[in-house]
Amino acid sequence: MSEQKLLLFRKWDTTEIVINDLGLKTAISLKQVIIPLDFGRSALKRYNKGQVNIVERLANKLMHFGKKYAKNTGRQGGKKHHSLNIVKTAFEIIHLKTGKNPVEILVRAVENSAPNEDTTRIVYGGTVYHVSVDVAPLRRVDLALRFISDAIKEATFSLSLIHI
């Protein structure tokens, strides 16, 4: 009996995707699921979010709308099914326009937008110095997904895109 592949949203295969960035191989999970839902099981251990599917992490980032004025409620607050439908529709549009696997395009976007260095503040005798430090792989993926989701939100609600 042959083993059946689990396709993401019953359409896209994640087994053939290769992660080119060696530092991100442990932080990007492409485990086979039909619907990327974890039900918060990853929150039980400290570094367990690296085991969560990258598509689910993108949907989680889309649910949070920013820190200013408690924007994690309202439009997308807690509506994960709505966020997953948005991601699924976006994947279908990407597949129609490019003809490629949209999960692979998401992985390439995360690899390209993940920062390698960041700055931190060091205080010596009242003087503040900014020192560059390397970024951990999980933080690199978190920042890349945050940059992507912020760009999505900015493009969605931008007034420059509205044609009068």
Positions of the model-derived regions?
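Conserved small/polar residues in nucleotide/adenosyl-binding loops
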Residues: 162-164
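Acidic, compositionally biased tether/linker regions
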Residues: 51-53, 57-66, 118-159
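C-terminal end-helix/capping segment
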Residues: 100-120
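Ribosome large-subunit tunnel/peptidyl-transferase-proximal elements
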Residues: 33-104
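Core subunits and conserved enzymes of cellular information-processing
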Residues: 94-99, 108-111, 133, 137, ...
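Contiguous, often N-terminal, cationic amphipathic patches that form binding interfaces
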Residues: 1-56, 125, 129
